[in-house]
Amino acid sequence: MMKPWENISYFGNQKIISQLDTLYENDKLNSTLLFNGSYGLGKATLAFRYSNYILNQKTEKFTSFSIKNNTITNMIKKNVHPDLIYISNNDQDNSNHEIKIDQIRTLKTKLISKTLNGTNRIVIIDPLESLNKSSFNSLLKV
């Protein structure tokens, strides 16, 4: 199964993609976005795609954005881009677990550092429901 950050093609959610463009054009895009829905709808894929768009410094509308084969995209595919922090409930062996407070503490440490090229810093937590009570409370204090 393809990981969300590896997926170059994206189909669906065109209404959401258009809304993201409209919010950005009207300078009303919040610093936090929450994608909600059933498993398998493409929420994480959309989040990684929008992250790629933002980190590539938005040279076009998101509705017409196509993922380019460049350094930023390759870093995202390898999950090593310093300005994109991905917190998941999957271990190396793909077993699900809760997201623990240590992961959120590590996130806080990473958020203190400067961004690469002065771009935005993006955090994707997938799924948010996997935060335990302590990690959720810690996240609220970021």
Which role fits each region the language model picked out?
Residues M2-S134:
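Clamp-loader machinery-focused feature within the broader ASCE/P-loop NTPase space
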Residues I112, N137-V142:
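Conserved catalytic/switch belt of AAA+ P-loop NTPases
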